[in-house]
């Protein structure tokens, strides 16, 4: 068994990843995940963004300590600033969407799906819709046409543009589109705003290579065809015909939905 230490800030050690492993033992294949728990001699250590306390340590080869970036709304120079550059020096591998001075590997943000939740602790809570459920899911009855999930968050330029776009879509489509989101029309779980809909609009914080978040994955999991605004290289990860790429609000958008 490979023992993997995982540091996940913002959550306690009692969280469960059963949605993603399909069991309560935090085991996937031959890997055991120790989430925010003390383990003295792990085989590998994944750190999501930061550590959970002022100091955190274990006995491990430094080359096996891996940094994983998850945030999608950082400024482009976030990891070029001195405090972050120094922080990244201690990792054997760095996976991030953003530019770094340190040697790094470009990849998508390391985010869980959120279709069974609405952020916070509910992300890592048990659900009957776990990985095994989604692996077997082939069809869902669609009773509605179009939805979007976009909160009223507006503290970055990307948030403001996304919110403006959502207002424009609602003005254009009217009752054809259902708009959900914290501060707008909250949902306990995103499943309720995706699974009943034939189409779903997914808008990222930025139009940046590799910046592909749960916003697209949740649409796939709910079997709702995504109209997607996000990474230019999305087709490096998903078939081109599995989504429609938006270039902001398009004049022929309504016609394309009925194709």
Where do the PLM segments sit?
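Short, intrinsically disordered, charge-balanced linker/junction segments flanking boundaries
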Residues: 253-259
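Nucleotide-sugar donor-binding catalytic core of glycosyltransferases
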Residues: 1-245, 250-253
């Amino acid at each position: 068994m490979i023992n993997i230490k995982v540091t996940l800030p913002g959550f306690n050690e009692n969280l469960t990843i059963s949605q993603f492993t399909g069991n309560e033992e935090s085991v996937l294949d031959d890997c055991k995940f120790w989430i925010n728990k003390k383990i003295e001699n792990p085989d590998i250590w994944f750190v999501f963004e930061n550590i959970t306390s002022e100091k955190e340590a274990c006995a491990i080869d430094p080359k096996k300590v891996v940094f994983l970036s998850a945030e999608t709304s950082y400024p482009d120079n976030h990891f070029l600033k001195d405090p972050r550059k120094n922080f990244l020096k201690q990792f054997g591998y760095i996976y991030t969407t953003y530019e770094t001075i340190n040697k790094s590997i470009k990849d998508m943000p390391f985010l869980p799906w959120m279709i069974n939740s609405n952020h916070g602790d509910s992300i890592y809570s048990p659900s009957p819709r776990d990985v095994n459920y989604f692996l077997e899911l082939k069809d869902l009855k669609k009773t509605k046409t179009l939805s979007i999930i976009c909160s009223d968050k507006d503290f970055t330029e990307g948030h403001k543009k996304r919110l403006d776009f959502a207002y424009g879509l609602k003005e254009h489509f009217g009752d054809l589109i259902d708009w959900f989101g914290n501060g707008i029309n909250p949902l306990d779980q995103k499943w309720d705003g995706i699974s009943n809909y034939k189409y779903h609009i997914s808008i990222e914080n930025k139009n940046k290579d590799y910046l592909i978040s749960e916003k697209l994955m949740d649409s796939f999991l709910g079997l709702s065809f995504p109209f997607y605004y996000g990474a230019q290289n999305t087709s490096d990860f998903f078939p081109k015909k599995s989504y429609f790429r938006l270039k902001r609000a398009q004049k022929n958008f309504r016609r394309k939905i009925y194709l």
